[in-house]
Every structure is written in structure tokens, then in C-alpha cells.
Amino acid sequence: MFVLNRSSGLIHRSVPLLAQVSTPTTSTTKLAQLHTTHALSKEDYYKTLGVDKKSDAKAIKKAYFQLAKKYHPDVNKTKEAQTKFQEISEAYEVLSDDTKRQEYDAYGSGGGPAGGRGGAGGFHHHGNVDVNEIFRRAFGGGGGMGGFNFDNFAQSAFGHSAAQEMVMDISFEEAVRGATKNVSVNVVEDCLKCHGTQVEPGHKKTSCPYCNGTGAVSQRLQGGFFYQTTCNRCRGSGHYNKNPCQECEGEGQTVQRRQVSFNVPAGTNNGDSLKFQVGKNQLFVRFNVAPSLKFRREKDDIHCDVDISLAQAVLGGTVKVPGINGDTYVHIPAGTGSHTKMRLTGKGVKRLHSYGNGDQYMHIKVTVPKYLTAEQKQIMLAWAATEQLKDGTIKGLEKNQKTEEKETKKNEEKKSEGASESQKRRSEPVAENAETIDENQENEGFFEKIKRKIFG
């Protein structure tokens, strides 16, 4: 790209994709270069945003927002989206500023309206494009997009309307105990600049010239009949706003960010909604309760698992049990088995729509040690020796049990009269040792056996 200097007649070669900046009026002369996406033609800015050249500031801002939702780098990670977002940000920066827009409409970017009769080089964009700064100026909030959720746009600092419903994540403990939460929401309030008058400060509304301040106009029908309709110009107000407020665009209200504090009721369930008033606005907060690692909730009752040792299960004792309002010690009766269910009355969740609290249920689990010390094993064997088993055996006590069974049988045989010795031998069979025979040795002759005995 070459730029003609008309005063000197020289042709200077400019760097591609760098917009030229006019010389500042201060004593220090600097050239602030703007890295643009491409050389835009006169219609390009409008085409980039998808708006007409007659679009007002509100339509341009809305179009920019719709495109930002689609191409912002925090939402769309592709390189094409980054380039597109740079383009729409550049276009919005020019078209949202009245002075820059007038200059752009007059000169374009590649020459004047007649194709080159404008100023040298046509329209040149001044300053550095910071897409985050442009976005911040357009919609408020921080420059970055961290934590920005386009699905909940109305709840964010960048929204065009007040938030009517929002979802809040709370912990299990906050839900059952209650908590105080702070949140930032969008509300529609009177414009801070015009205070709801819709008129630029220093000006007043005038009487509507189309209805003479009546708010209605008369129209004549065929047959000589007349009927009145609402004035389309003033919409029935009877006033004409010649100087609308620039901040609210004559609406009298703007979306403003408010910090509000509210109480989460104790006993809140997952999915419950809370309605409260923020100025003139109603806000519904729906709670998303995170699951607990300790408790399981069933309506107003809570359940928890409690581990006890083998000795506690047999002998009884006390155990520390977690609760929603703090830990407590509970007595464990002697002989408590695993999966025993115990109840603590009134230790559950506070009832939202009635008095009192639910109950807390403990599910006992007896923990059995996998490894024992030598001392512990001897103690367990001594205890096991005193047990009367109906079926089965205990590892480590098999020999003692077999000896006792033999002695019992002998005593029974002595008491029985007329029992023969053969019957006693049959009642006490003795296992014999069997020799293992090789199949090849079974078919050997007499001399082969002698030879094998002598020579091996």
C-alpha cells in the first residue's frame, strides 16, 4: 500500500495492516500504530457487524453483542474466531463513536465518497485496538472474560436486561444450617444521568407537534365519521423528546449492577427457589446443593455411616458421630452387630414449613482387622476355643477339635455293651500310606525286577 504526500509529491510506502495516525498537537510527536485485521472498505464496518448504515447506536451495540457471544476467544477457541472478534471489535469501536462514525461515513477507509477524493489515505483509525477494553466499555465489568457465562447473560455485568432468575451453588452444610450469601445481579433502575426523566440534563420535553400534546390523533373515515387513535409519535404521552438522554437513549432506565445480601433458610433442599425484592425488581434464586461426603439426606432426616471396632461391638462403649451442628458421642450397646440402625431424635434437618427437626440415623459398620499381631491372634484363639460352633471350623483350632472328637467316640464305645472289637475298628478307620506305582513298572518280568534291584 502506498500513500501519496500531496505537499511534497513524494510517494511513501506504508507498512501493510498498519493504520496511520495523525500527528498529535503536543510537543512530543509519536506515531501510535494500530494493528488492524485488514484494509476495510467503506461498507466493511457495517457489513462486519451486519447492520445498515442508518442503524442507531442501540442496534449497533446489540449486533456487536450477538457477534461477541459467538466469536469471543473465551467462548470460541479457533483462530478464525479470534480474527473475527478482532474485526467486529474494530468495527464497533468506530461505529459506536459519533465522531469516528461521521469521519468514516465521509471518507471511508480507502478514499473519499467519490473513490479517492477525500483526505490523504482516506479514513484512518487512530489508537490501539484493545478488544477486551472495547468489550468492557460496551457492556461494563472487567476487561477479561474470566467466569463470563453467555448462557446466563442477563445475570452478568454485561447484560441488557435485569436478571429474573439465577442459579446459586451452595454446600450441603449451608443448605441444612442456613447461611448468608452475597451476590451481584443486574437490576433495572432509573437512569443515573437523567434520573428517569428520559431527557438530557438541561433540556425538557416539548409538546408533541403531531397531536398538539393531546396524545391522540383523529382520523376521518368514509361517511364523515371520525375516530381517535393513540399518537404514533409520542405514543400517547403528549410529549416530544427532542433531546433524549445519551446514557439511557431516552428510555429513562438502565441496567445497573447491584450487590445484594440474602439469607439461605436452614433446611433448603436442592432445587428450592427463593424470591426477594431488589429495588423495583423481583429476583428468583434457585439453589443447587452440592452432595455431602458424610451425610445422605432423605427429606428432613439425615443418614450417616459409623465405624466401630470389633471390641466395641462385643463389649460396647462410646463412639464419636458427626452431626450437622457438630460431633457428638453416642453409647454403643454390648453385642451391637454390623448394619445395626440407630436413631438420634431431633438431630436432623430443620423443617422449613413446620416446627422441629428431622432425625439422624446411624448405620453401624463393624470393622474387622485384616492383620493381627501374635498376641492378638493368641487372644482370639483362646476366645474361639470357648465358642460352641454349630457348623464349620475355626482356623488354628482343627487339631484340638479332632482330638476332642476322638476322645468322645472312645468314651461312647466303652459305655456301649456287647460291642465287638471288629465294630470298634470299623468305627475308628486308620488311613494307610499308599505307594505310588509307575505304569511302566507294572508290566516288568521276574528277571527285569532282579536286574533293576541290583543295578538300579
From Swiss-Prot:
CXXCXGXG motif repeat positions: 208-215, 231-238, 245-252
Stretch list, region Disordered: 395-443
Keyword Cell inner membrane: no
CDD domains per record: DnaJ (cd06257), DnaJ_C (cd10747), DnaJ_zf (cd10719)
ZnF (CR-type) intervals: 178-257
Keyword Transit peptide appears in the UniProt entry: no
A GO cellular-component term linked to this record: mitochondrion
Pfam annotation, one family: DnaJ_CXXCXGXG
InterPro entries: Apopto_cytoskel_mod (IPR051938), DnaJ (IPR012724), DnaJ_C (IPR002939), DnaJ_domain (IPR001623), DnaJ_domain_CS (IPR018253), HSP40/DnaJ_pept-bd (IPR008971), HSP_DnaJ_Cys-rich_dom (IPR001305), HSP_DnaJ_Cys-rich_dom_sf (IPR036410)
SUPFAM superfamilies: Chaperone J-domain, DnaJ/Hsp40 cysteine-rich domain, HSP40/DnaJ peptide-binding domain
Keyword entries, A-Z: Chaperone, Metal-binding, Repeat, Zinc, Zinc-finger
One Gene Ontology MF term: heat shock protein binding
Residue span, J domain: 44-108
HAMAP family: DnaJ
Protein's recorded name: DnaJ homolog dnj-10
Organism: Caenorhabditis elegans
Source lineage: Eukaryota, Metazoa, Ecdysozoa, Nematoda, Chromadorea
Gene that encodes the chain: dnj-10
